[in-house]
């Protein structure tokens, strides 16, 4: 009787954990699949040489606007890495619970948006004029953030910690944090760059265009809609 119970328990563990681990590794491979598509859209080798000469220009290296643009690219990548890391924490927390429905929801949510997010990151970096080698490095860091954090979260939690996280709904909190970072990066960094100074490639004297009232309203509305929809659905 004990042997049968132990066998059943051990056979259920892989079933519960498998979707989350499969999602974590699939996220990494999905993002890597974007790389060949982006390489096909990048300039030729001759244009790459021109880009390298452009980045080696001492006038541009000493230009504060060029430095600001470089910092913007790094900040955008860093924000999306934090977003992906939060996805990984949510994934690891979901895998540590016995709620199969939560695991499935997190799995589907991450699979649906990870590849478009990676493609958007690469498109933004290409639009900003970053060379292909640096784009690959940015993409690699972004693609590894979710699976690495999911495994660290799952393997680093003790049994008592998993129970405590389950009580405070750590998966939901991590997903909320992930969504917030994504909204912040998209609204504060990507949209102003693409919709404002990105078309002319000539920043104004103030160092770039700030957010308009409409953009701020859209950001606030995007934050409030999930809160409004969640009213009356507390479990």
Curated annotation (Swiss-Prot):
Annotated glycan sites: 2, 169
Residue spans crossing the bilayer: 11-31, 75-95, 104-124, 138-158, 172-192, 214-234
GO biological process: bicellular tight junction assembly; intracellular zinc ion homeostasis; regulation of cellular response to testosterone stimulus; regulation of vascular endothelial cell proliferation; zinc ion transmembrane transport
Membrane topology listed for this record: Multi-pass membrane protein
Enzymatic reactions: Zn(2+)(in) = Zn(2+)(out)
Coiled coil: none
Pfam families to which the protein is assigned, alphabetical: Zip
A GO-annotated cellular component: mitochondrion
Superkingdom as given in the UniProt entry: Eukaryota
Record's subcellular location: Golgi apparatus, trans-Golgi network membrane; Cell membrane; Cytoplasm, Perinuclear region; Mitochondrion
Keywords tagged on the record: Cell membrane, Cytoplasm, Glycoprotein, Golgi apparatus, Ion transport, Membrane, Mitochondrion, Nucleus, Transmembrane, Transmembrane helix, Transport, Zinc, Zinc transport
Keyword hit for Glycoprotein: yes
Signal sequence bounds: none
Principal cellular location given in the protein's record: Golgi
MF terms in GO: androgen binding; G protein-coupled receptor activity; zinc efflux transmembrane transporter activity; zinc ion transmembrane transporter activity
Role, per record: Transports zinc ions across cell and organelle membranes into the cytoplasm and regulates intracellular zinc homeostasis. Participates in the zinc ions efflux out of the secretory compartments. Regulates intracellular zinc level, resulting in the enhancement of AKT1 and MAPK3/MAPK1 (Erk1/2) phosphorylation in response to the BCR activation. Also functions as a membrane androgen receptor that mediates, through a G protein, the non-classical androgen signaling pathway, characterized by the activation of MAPK3/MAPK1 (Erk1/2) and transcription factors CREB1 or ATF1.
The family this protein is said to belong to: Belongs to the ZIP transporter (TC 2.A.5) family.
Protein name: Zinc transporter ZIP9
Organism in which the protein naturally occurs: Macaca fascicularis
């Amino acid at each position: 009787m004990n042997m049968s119970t132990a066998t059943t328990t051990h056979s259920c563990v892989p079933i519960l954990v498998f979707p989350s681990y499969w999602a974590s590794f699939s996220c990494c491979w999905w993002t890597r699949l974007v790389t060949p598509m982006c390489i096909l859209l990048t300039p030729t080798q001759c244009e790459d040489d021109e880009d390298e000469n452009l980045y080696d220009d001492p006038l541009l290296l000493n230009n504060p606007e060029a430095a600001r643009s470089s910092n913007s690219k790094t900040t955008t990548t860093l924000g999306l890495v934090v977003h992906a890391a939060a996805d990984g924490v949510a994934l690891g927390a979901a895998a540590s619970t016995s709620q199969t429905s939560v695991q499935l929801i997190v799995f589907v949510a991450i699979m649906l948006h990870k590849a478009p997010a990676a493609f958007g990151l690469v498109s933004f970096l290409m639009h900003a004029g970053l060379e292909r080698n640096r784009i690959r490095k940015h993409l690699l860091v972004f693609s590894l953030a979710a699976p690495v954090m999911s495994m660290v979260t799952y393997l680093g939690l003790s049994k008592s910690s998993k129970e405590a996280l389950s009580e405070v709904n750590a998966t939901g909190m991590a997903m909320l944090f992930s969504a917030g970072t994504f909204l912040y990066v998209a609204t504060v960094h990507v949209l102003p760059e693409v919709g404002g100074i990105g078309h002319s490639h000539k920043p104004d004297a103030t160092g770039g265009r700030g957010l308009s009232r409409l953009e701020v309203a859209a950001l606030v509305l995007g934050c409030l809609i999930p809160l409004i929809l969640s009213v009356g659905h507390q479990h």
